[in-house]
Amino acid sequence: MRVTVFHNSIPASITAAQKLTKLLKSGHFELDERHPEVVVTIGGDGTLLSAFHRYADQLNSIRFIGVHTGHLGFYTDWRDFEIEDLVIALKEDSGQSVSYPLLDVQATYADATSAHYLALNESTLKRLNGTMRTEVYIKGDFFESFRGDGLCVSTPTGSTAYSKSNGGAVIHPRLDALQMTEIASINNRVFRTLSSPIITAPDEWVTLEPTGRDDYVMTVDQFVINPPTIKQIRYKIAKERIHFARYRHMHFWDRVEDAFIGAKH
């Protein structure tokens, strides 16, 4: 099995990565940073997001495993004191995995160029100064004219991240749906939006067409993109999926409870 270890720079992660690398070598695993079959991330959810984007062009052949060295991570199933148990699980691996939907982001600019991105959690559109104005279409049909600070489009797993902070619903990842939430929308007698999260069907897509300004900022997960003048952004569920090696089974709602409520501890 080809394995690589991807870690952040905090001391606990570096120590855990060194220990894991040593055990992998003694266990006769092939360490392959370029074309791994399994990517073990050590850190937190941010580290896993970075690894996802690092290997976004190899998603069909890679499974991810998350080890957290700080606070509990939503994508991480292992703690740094369980490194030996993780290596045993890798040795007994039979290919078991679980997959989650991803967000396909297609941006078209006023100069006729375009860019394509994949997001594990979410993508947002905001304006640097003043009120953002954008037309919103669902499956090609006009839905509303939005005015406010911004819009957030998320995956089911991303529904527990920034989208939740915007009042979005938590969506089970078995649903191939995307969710759009508003960021401080303007609502009065003149300007009206739905003022509610929108959850779309698997065959639907959301299109944003911002109007009149070139100071918009787009984010894709943790990355901030300052593009040229945006003509259109189209969001849909991607054909690609992210795969996690699943040696332990933790129900999604148990994971949500553990991350946000913690009443069982």
Curated annotation (Swiss-Prot):
It is an enzyme of class 2 (transferase). Its main location: cytoplasm. It comes from the Bacteria. It is found in: Cytoplasm. NAD(+) binds at D45, G46, N121, E122, R147, D149, T160, A161, Y162, S163, K164, S165, A184, Q222. Keywords: ATP-binding, Cytoplasm, Kinase, NAD, NADP, Nucleotide-binding, Transferase. Belongs to the NAD kinase family. This is NAD kinase. It comes from Lacticaseibacillus paracasei (strain ATCC 334 / BCRC 17002 / CCUG 31169 / CIP 107868 / KCTC 3260 / NRRL B-441). The gene is nadK.
